[in-house]
């Protein structure tokens, strides 16, 4: 009987301990049978509750309507957890998650890998977590499930339990902004997991796309346009001035040889006796060929006659004396027959200049005058006037003749006409130097002409301001355009204070030939007179006075100007 009492007491103690354990932990002693998963499927956590009133069936039916359910650990009235694994579903075809066997939550969670020492499962590293002490209404929870990518939220409810929600992928139509993150114990617990040591809980959405739109700089486009100018060809009569200017300055040197006296030829022969005749003939032949090529190059252009139209900026760079082609240049072909029957025509010759390249040279040929045009040439200039210009140009190089005075007193109707047209169409000099012109060409409005003109800086080392404009610090030169009626350009110079020099040795003069067209022709037409006059700017200014069309203040002052004038006379 005593053994029976001991056994009964032991049984009562076991029952008492089981009751106390059930009351203390709130864990089920018996596993209720629920609609379990299909045999052989993966075990999934479902809603688990130890309370006598389980979750309503209506809520379980609404859960499959979500495009992607949330992993939720939600305590109910008796401090229990509700865990739901995310199910990948499409709207309209959702299936309810499978419910595994009901077991104690703590034992099931500890069986998961990586959660031996934690109370939560390993979250998605792309999720975000936030916690708030206030409970959220059921309606707000349902709306949160409709987010395109909700945050991993752990919210404390009435009985101190947590609700854990995994991000759900929905359509972007019902997106709402994510809630602000807060530092909570849950975040600290998540960061302790080995898989999340180096992970960022606020990792941005990897599905985001970044579009980079390249916007072209308008300033770069302007710079390109500046290099491409001039885009419009000027009137045809602009280039028609050039042949007459060439003839005016240099003339035809053949007439000089015919006018020499027999004694002069004899003196040359005596001087040549000291050298072999073969060397002299070879040098004369080379000089003759160079003169013919140069004359044909300047007078007729590198590709065709001047009548072919405007030359592109790249064509304005004439041949350099230094050749960078290491292959020996081939000989020119014979000149082609003259293209005309009377008056003037054209001749061409060619030579290979490389693979697929042929250089062409053109020159004019003189033919008997056509009937009715004996007294006029193609430019409308009398033939006698051509001879007079040639004779004047020849006399300029005579040591016994004052070349400067000869040039200044040249009474040519053609030159007068050209100068008149040039001075009438050129823009007026700005009273102040535009500093932006040092970097790129500028456009300035000219009130007298009623349109804008392009100007470029002319203060570079090649301009040699220290020689030709010694008191100038800056210079400007107008650019040719489609509206230019001549090949001339306005030249303006300024002092150190960027003020226009209206007189004196530093003032600029209008240029007969613009450097935009040809720097070499500009030197021969505009710089050569300065050399012939031996730097006496006062004599040159008498023919081509510096421009002051905007009535700028006289610069330099009267006293300094008179001192410069006296210096020029004595020099």
UniProtKB/Swiss-Prot annotation:
Entries under Pfam families matching the protein: AMOP (PF03782), TSP_1 (PF00090)
Q: Which GO terms describe its cellular component?
A: extracellular region
Compositionally biased region (Polar residues): 116-131
Q: Compositionally biased, Basic and acidic residues: which spans?
A: 257-268
The record's subcellular location field reads:
Secreted
- SS bond list: 338-365, 342-370, 353-357
Q: Which residues are glycosylated?
A: 117, 300, 392
Superkingdom? Eukaryota
Which UniProt keywords are given for this protein, alphabetically ordered?
Answer: Disulfide bond, Glycoprotein, Secreted, Signal
User: Where are the residues of the annotated region Disordered?
Assistant: 30-60, 116-141, 257-294
Q: What is its main location?
A: secreted
* Keyword Hydrolase recorded: no
Secretion signal span: 1-26
User: Where does the AMOP domain start and stop, copy by copy?
Assistant: 396-559
What tissue expression does the UniProt record report for this protein?
Expressed at high levels in the placenta and at moderate levels in the pancreas, kidney, heart, liver, lung, brain and skeletal muscle.
Annotated TSP type-1 domain residues: 327-371
Q: Where is the composition biased (Acidic residues)?
A: 269-294
User: Cell division: is it a keyword of this entry?
Assistant: no
The family classification in the record reads: Belongs to the isthmin family.
Q: Output this protein's name.
A: Isthmin-2
Q: Which organism is it from?
A: Homo sapiens (Human)
